[in-house]
Amino acid sequence: IDEVSPHQPVHVVAHDWGSIQSWESVTEPAMQGRIASFTSCSGPCLDHMGHWFRDRLRRPTWRGLKEVALQSVKSWYIYLFQLPVVPNLIWRLGMGAAWPTLLRLLEGIEVKARDGQASDGSHGVQLYRANMMPRLFFPRLRKAHAPVQLLVPTRDLYVSPALTQDLSRWVDQLTRIEFNAGHWMPLSHPSEMAGAVRRFVRQVERQGEAARGWGLG
């Protein structure tokens, strides 16, 4: 942010781990005023996710337990990535080369194979090991200091839409839009995603102009 916009707050758009990492900035008090808005797709705040699980297990209901069970099944790969050595070998010995085929079979998306896919996937495993369990078991209280838009693919194989249904306690200015799309929505529905981002950014900027006009900004 300091490099691309040192004097003006920025609009952040992120997906998957980019979104998970961006939540850190959007909920970090030291970053307040640097981020104008945040559009998140298929990448929840890990602290919010930890509280989501905790709340449903502490005050169990049939619906809540079903949501926990469904998300636990969707998160199968997270458990795999906690194992030593094995997931890294899977990426380097075959998963990297098979990635385009997997996306085509699971999501109907055509992507080209690229150099570095295997090493990127192997390094990505470290993100899960370093961040997932500490935040899920010991979640912090993290409130967003910027308007947040959630783009929710209802056919996401890894992130349940239910994970984003209780975020009003963490986000004061929240917009949530569901799409009939899979996890890789930026690849499968780029126009719809771009349109949602444009509309949200314009809305936030209009609200900012109105607040400044009233002497509130």
Indicate where each model-derived feature is located.
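Flexible "cap/lid" subdomain of the alpha/beta-hydrolase fold that forms the substrate-access gate
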Residues: 1-13, 20-174
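Short active-site segment of divalent metal-dependent hydrolases/proteases
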Residues: 18-19, 186
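Catalytic active-site module of serine/aspartate enzymes centered on a nucleophile-bearing elbow/loop
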Residues: 172-217
